[in-house]
Amino acid sequence: YLWENRLMKNIVPYIHEQFPDQDIEFITGNNDTDLYSYFKEHDELPDIITVRRFSGTDAQDLQPYLMDFASYDVVSKYYSYAVQYYKNAEDEIQWLPICGIPQTIIANKTLFDQYGVKIPENYEEYVQACQQFYDNGIKPYSMDLGEDWSNNEIIQAAAIGEFTSLDGIEWRNGAETAVDEVKFDDALWKRIFSETSQFLKDSHFGKEDINIDVDTGIQMFAEGKSAMFHGHPTVMQQLQKQMDAELIRIPYFSQTSDESYVYMTPSLNIAFNKNLEKDREKLDTALDVLDCMISEEGQKLIADGSGVISLNTDVPTMMQDVPGLEEEINNNAVYIRYSAQKSFDASLEAVHGLLSGEMDEIQAYDTLRSVMNRKAPEEKATVNFENEYSISLNDRNGRDAASSILTTIREENDAQLALAPYYYFTSSIYKGECTNSRVGMMTAKSSDTALYVAKI
């Protein structure tokens, strides 16, 4: 199972080329471990599963059913910093990250030069640069704070010195292995929110930024109305094609020292079904697939281009086309983002509270802590499936679950034709009652996955 359809287009053909004699089926999933919990409830946990948004706390219910990589050679191919947050309470490594993507500030160097603004090399200089642009009527930073991932990023990036401190690492290790609730170090998190609030002020973010989505933020930057945006290398490449300007990358700066860091998101996190260990041939194939994915070519395809931070000792980091981060990369000053599922909603509520003026730093911290440990309400079943259909490919009808869903959509729309990409469908249909959220998991969530209906 691959967490998004882009991987079906990029890495799947390469894997099939490497193993032409192996019958390997790939299915698009969703970026949520709940999908795999749903499969496990019906004894259909896939052999290989992947997600991007992940924390050990999100996969607690899957822990008894996942293989421990620690006893296999593949772990020795990873830098120690890359797996430090991947050990569970039993000291097992059930998940592995596959290549990192730098998510840092993208700066319009041409605009910096035009206004005589120095490219910042520490936090103090970043603050000065923001003030100079603000004084000249240019928005310093058009971050898309209407999106949950950017709110998640801004807390960790603003206080990156705290998250990389001994206290921060200790908290992160505990948060990644928490069973019932995530415990918070009040002293640490009050500092984190103090620095988050300061970063928002220093960057001249305000209430209006709550409504800036990714398209608006990009447009402001592309039109020269803001001096900085943020994103991964592919975003920078796309912007460079649109803009008649020189773009460079700026790392995130610690507010407590002169250190700077690359904020990094794993392209995906991967786990194996424990049952693979009962079938040596299947396990060897799965390990071969993993080796293929962490190879140099595999990482390029997964990361979709240049700007790949290799997490493996035998594969070089591919950052030749991503200037501005050389020192941080050479020093391994790389921070792997915390991406527990609940942290995105929690960050959005807290940061929006600060921006709107409705919360002070303490209230924002209390809100984040509350949302992180909020228990999900028990969901009632909304539909009862009378029949069962598999998502697996068969020789007769293709994918029965996909056919059933698409036929239902066609009939509900009184249409003669319904058309969708094969990777639109993610899950089998299981007989019996099902909740609305589980029904929602049966189709992919990628924005470029279109569905068409037509009356003929």
Give names to the regions the model predicted.
Residues 37-40, 46-47, 75-111, 139-140, ...:
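A structural signal for short loop-to-beta-strand junctions that line the ligand-binding cleft
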Residues 113, 299, 313, 327-421, ...:
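Conserved C-terminal helix/tail region of periplasmic/extracytoplasmic solute-binding proteins
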Residues 52-104, 118, 127, 154-156, ...:
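Hinge/lid segment of periplasmic solute-binding proteins
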Residues 68-80, 84, 162-191, 241-242, ...:
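Short, solvent-exposed loop/beta-turn-alpha elements that line the ligand-binding surface or hinge
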Residues 132, 174-210:
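Glycine-centered hinge/linker elements that transmit conformational signals in sensory
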Residues 1-56, 119, 362-363, 370-411:
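Conserved N-terminal structural module of periplasmic/extracytoplasmic solute-binding proteins
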Residues 94, 127-180:
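Extracytoplasmic/periplasmic solute-binding protein
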